[in-house]
């Protein structure tokens, strides 16, 4: 939601999808909430996605492949000197899925202009990291030669903003893939049907890493 608000969507836009209203700007009330797709002229484009965890990695990497192809063939549009960058937003647990491995393999091999933004809150719906993966996902992603990985404190707004600006600038100029791994707390519920109180004993610790009070200091 924060990314959507950051690109210019309004809280009303998001609530229209939650309540499946016909004026929902993403799908006219047809898709599940938090499943945006967008083709507004004045905003970044968001391709449609399904609910399968991690599946967004392949189509977004495909978009980056298409951008590279157009550039190599001399067919690319002029965006005022700013080369386009594709962003794939992922959760840390989704990085265990096969689709993510396939996407990273091709992005590394072909050097696509894409940024994989991984929000790592240490949880996979209701299972913690130790129950779902053998290692920190950055160790796995660093195994793909040609993909640069940066790990940051995702609760530090200034650091996040600066890092993403630097990464975007590099990808626009050098046309190569990045992974930005942001360590964040899980503050809310996964969904209204999977409530945090049922399975978590780290709520007080997570609250100490809430980025909102830090931003207001």
Residue ranges and their predicted role:
Residues 120-127, 147-152, 194-205:
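Short beta-alpha connecting loops at secondary-structure transitions
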Residues 111, 116-119:
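Short internal beta-strands
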Residues 14, 170-217:
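Glycine/aspartate-rich loop-and-adjacent alpha/beta segment that forms the canonical ThDP
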Residues 5, 9, 53, 154-161, ...:
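Electropositive phosphate-/nucleotide-binding environments in soluble metabolic enzymes
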Residues 84, 112, 174-176:
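Short coil/turn segments at beta-strand junctions that form active-site/ligand-binding loops
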Residues 1-110, 128-138, 142-146:
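Cofactor-binding active-site loop characterized by glycine-rich and histidine/acidic residues
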């Amino acid at each position: 939601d924060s990314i959507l608000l950051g690109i210019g969507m309004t809280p009303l836009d998001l609530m229209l999808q939650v309540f499946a209203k016909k004026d929902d700007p993403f799908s006219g009330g047809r898709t599940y909430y938090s499943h945006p797709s967008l083709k507004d002229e004045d905003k970044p484009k968001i391709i449609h996605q399904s609910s399968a965890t991690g599946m967004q990695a392949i189509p977004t990497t495909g978009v980056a492949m298409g951008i590279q192809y157009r550039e190599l063939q001399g067919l690319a549009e002029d965006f005022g000197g700013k080369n386009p960058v594709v962003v794939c937003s992922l959760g840390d647990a989704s990085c265990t899925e096969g689709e993510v491995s396939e996407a990273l393999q091709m992005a590394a091999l072909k050097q696509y202009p894409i940024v994989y933004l991984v929000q790592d809150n240490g949880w996979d719906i209701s299972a913690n990291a130790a129950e779902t993966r053998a290692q920190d996902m950055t160790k796995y992603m660093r195994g793909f030669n040609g993909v640069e990985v940066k790990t940051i404190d995702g609760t530090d707004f200034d650091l996040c903003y600066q890092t993403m600006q630097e990464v975007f600038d590099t990808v626009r100029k050098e046309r190569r893939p990045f992974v930005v791994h942001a360590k964040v707390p899980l503050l809310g519920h996964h969904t209204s049907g999977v409530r945090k109180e049922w399975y978590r004993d780290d709520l007080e610790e997570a609250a100490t890493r809430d980025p909102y009070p830090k931003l207001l200091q």
